[in-house]
UniProtKB/Swiss-Prot annotation:
The Resolvase/invertase-type recombinase catalytic domain, residue ranges: 1-134
Cited Gene3D superfamilies: Homeodomain-like, Resolvase, N-terminal catalytic domain
Record-annotated active site: 9
Keywords: DNA integration, DNA invertase, DNA recombination, DNA-binding, Viral receptor tropism switching, Virus entry into host cell
Keyword DNA-binding: yes
Similarity-based family: Belongs to the site-specific recombinase resolvase family.
One Pfam match: HTH_7
InterPro entries: Homeodomain-like_sf, Recombinase_CS, Resolv_N, Resolvase-like_N_sf, Resolvase_HTH_dom, SSR_resolvase
Endpoints of the signal sequence: none
Organism: Escherichia phage P1 (Bacteriophage P1)
GO MF, one annotated term: DNA binding
Protein name: DNA-invertase
DNA-binding segment(s): 161-180
């Protein structure tokens, strides 16, 4: 059975073009979502994935209508293949029921994996470069060491943590973490 899936990014957009193409391709059922492809929550896609069974073919008008990213798309099509379900994209001329279509998807999978590895590599290189320049990542500390020492001196003088917290606009729990209760009598 050919089962279609259409998606538009907003409620203002029309699914008619996609629906017509899927109907012309012979889709018996068509599911739809009106949401950004970046959103993981797509009820129409969830329904179609539950509905598909061995021997069915999921048909989309264009690849970007199905996947949020190339990696997501490859993973999704692999899951379909594992369940005995084919995938077809009309405008991209992809059909995983054919040897050429399966080959194309293997190539896409390899490219997606390479892309992921390159991102990891660039991220590591960027972090290493930042460390070499003395940056350690994360946000800047709210207080310099001198300010912490001032708080410590007040606590040592017996000023209650709550009062120090108000003076320095810091949570009492932060003071307990930085200066454990066993350190002071307050």
């Amino acid at each position: 059975m050919l089962i279609g899936y259409v998606r538009v990014s907003t409620n203002e957009q029309n699914t008619a073009l996609q629906r017509n193409a899927l109907e012309s391709a012979g889709c018996e059922l068509i599911f739809e979502d009106k949401a950004s492809g970046k959103k993981a929550e797509r009820p129409g896609l969830k329904k179609v994935l539950r509905m598909l069974s061995r021997g069915d073919t999921l048909v989309v008008w264009k690849l970007d209508r199905l996947g949020r990213s190339m990696r997501h798309l490859v993973v999704l099509v692999e899951e379909l293949r594992d369940r005995g379900i084919n995938f077809r994209s009309l405008t991209d001329s992809i059909d995983t029921s054919t040897p050429m279509g399966r080959f194309f998807f293997h190539v896409m999978g390899a490219l997606a994996e390479m892309e992921r590895e390159l991102i990891v590599e660039r991220t590591r290189a960027g972090l290493d470069a930042a460390r070499a320049e003395g940056r350690i990542g994360g946000r800047r500390p709210k207080y310099q060491e001198e300010t912490w020492q001032q708080m410590r001196r007040l606590l040592e003088k017996g000023i209650p943590r709550k009062q120090v917290a108000i003076i320095y606009d810091v949570a009492v729990s932060t003071l307990y973490k930085k200066f454990p209760a066993s350190s002071f009598q307050s």
